[in-house]
């Protein structure tokens, strides 16, 4: 569960932009090479388990979080009704009986 404000912080998808003037993947701007696999050649998108961008642990259950920039795992965020990135209350779970099984 992610709130509307944190939804903008989520990463971009590895797909090319639409071909228009000023796009970052055109060959004229030097942004994209022909026949380049962006998933393999992008250094900032590559997973580095021992680097400084490793995944955090959940503040509630101490398990690893599978989304960069999040402080809570999806199970705890769903169970508590909070945003997994900032912890803001998204859903009122007072009368719900929720499980994260």
Swiss-Prot record:
<dbReference type="GO" id="GO:0005681">
    <property type="term" value="C:spliceosomal complex"/>
</dbReference>
<dbReference type="GO" id="GO:0008380">
    <property type="term" value="P:RNA splicing"/>
</dbReference>
<keyword id="KW-0747">Spliceosome</keyword>
<dbReference type="GO" id="GO:0030425">
    <property type="term" value="C:dendrite"/>
</dbReference>
<dbReference type="GO" id="GO:0005737">
    <property type="term" value="C:cytoplasm"/>
</dbReference>
<comment type="function">
    <text>As a component of the minor spliceosome, involved in the splicing of U12-type introns in pre-mRNAs.</text>
</comment>
<keyword id="KW-0963">Cytoplasm</keyword>
<dbReference type="GO" id="GO:0008017">
    <property type="term" value="F:microtubule binding"/>
</dbReference>
<dbReference type="Pfam" id="PF10235">
    <property type="entry name" value="Cript"/>
</dbReference>
<dbReference type="InterPro" id="IPR019367">
    <property type="entry name" value="PDZ-binding_CRIPT"/>
</dbReference>
<keyword id="KW-0508">mRNA splicing</keyword>
<comment type="similarity">
    <text>Belongs to the CRIPT family.</text>
</comment>
<comment type="subunit">
    <text>Component of the minor spliceosome, which splices U12-type introns.</text>
</comment>
<protein>
    <recommendedName>
        <fullName>Cysteine-rich PDZ-binding protein</fullName>
    </recommendedName>
</protein>
<dbReference type="GO" id="GO:0006397">
    <property type="term" value="P:mRNA processing"/>
</dbReference>
<keyword id="KW-0507">mRNA processing</keyword>
<dbReference type="GO" id="GO:0031122">
    <property type="term" value="P:cytoplasmic microtubule organization"/>
</dbReference>
């Amino acid at each position: 569960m992610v709130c509307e404000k944190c939804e903008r912080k989520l990463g971009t998808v590895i797909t090319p932009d639409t071909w228009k003037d000023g796009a970052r993947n055109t060959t004229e701007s030097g942004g994209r090479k022909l026949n380049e696999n962006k998933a393999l050649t992008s250094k900032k998108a590559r997973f580095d388990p021992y680097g400084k961008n490793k995944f955090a642990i959940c503040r509630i259950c101490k398990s690893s979080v599978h989304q960069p920039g999040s402080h809570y795992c999806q199970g705890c965020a769903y169970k508590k009704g909070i945003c997994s990135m900032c912890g803001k209350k998204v859903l009122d779970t007072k009368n719900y009986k929720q499980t994260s099984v």
